[in-house]
Amino acid sequence: MQIFVKTLTGKTITLEVESSDTIDNVKSKIQDKEGIPPDQQRLIFAGKQLEDGRTLSDYNIQKESTLHLVLRLRGGGKKRKKKTYTTPKKIKHKHKKVELAVLKYYKVEDDGSVKRLRRECPNCGASTFMANHKDRLYCGRCHLTLKLEN
């Protein structure tokens, strides 16, 4: 019987085969006509890839059926090298949660009055305290720095 093999270029090859022929035999006949090695050939019929050991009758390939020939692609994408860093990673600052942190900012005097332990920022207003350094006061919000005189 006669079958057709359509290549990717659109060229159609005619092959004389029997329904008992294996897919290996068909691929070797394509190699004789086109010069493509059988290990690079993939034959597709009715949306299925044809396996080498099976026969044409296994796939219900009859006379004047058309097989599609595509080439097998070898391998995958290029592997990327893993980046090597010259300097070690910087350790992230861990935030320490302090229970009842408000107690650091105020003190209750013996007479019952409340005294502020830290100075509030004159630019930012109430509830923004300045950090105490050994020679200065610093506001972390507006970056105001006040120098202390001893």
From Swiss-Prot:
Pfam families: Ribosomal_S27, ubiquitin. A zinc finger (C4-type) spans 121-142. There is a cross-link at G76 (Glycyl lysine isopeptide (Gly-Lys) (interchain with K-? in acceptor proteins)). The keyword Coiled coil does not apply. CDD domains: Ubl_ubiquitin (cd01803). It comes from the Eukaryota. Gene3D superfamilies: 6.20.50.150, Phosphatidylinositol 3-kinase Catalytic Subunit, Chain A, domain 1. There is a cross-link at K6, K11, K27, K29, K33, K48, K63 (Glycyl lysine isopeptide (Lys-Gly) (interchain with G-Cter in ubiquitin)). The keyword Membrane does not apply. GO terms for cellular component: cytoplasm; cytosol; cytosolic small ribosomal subunit; nucleus. SUPFAM superfamilies: Ubiquitin-like, Zn-binding ribosomal proteins. Keywords: Cytoplasm, Isopeptide bond, Metal-binding, Nucleus, Ribonucleoprotein, Ribosomal protein, Ubl conjugation, Zinc, Zinc-finger. One of its GO terms (molecular function) is structural constituent of ribosome. GO terms for biological process: cytoplasmic translation; modification-dependent protein catabolic process; protein ubiquitination; ribosome biogenesis. Residues 1-76 form the Ubiquitin-like domain. Ubiquitin is encoded by 5 different genes. Ubi1 and ubi2 are synthesized as a polyprotein with one copy of ubiquitin fused to ribosomal proteins eL40A and eL40B, respectively. Ubi3 and ubi5 are polyproteins with one copy of ubiquitin fused to ribosomal proteins eS31A and eS31B, respectively. Ubi4 is a polyprotein containing 5 exact head to tail repeats of ubiquitin. There are 2 genes for eS31 in S.pombe. In the N-terminal section; belongs to the ubiquitin family. This is Ubiquitin-ribosomal protein eS31A fusion protein.
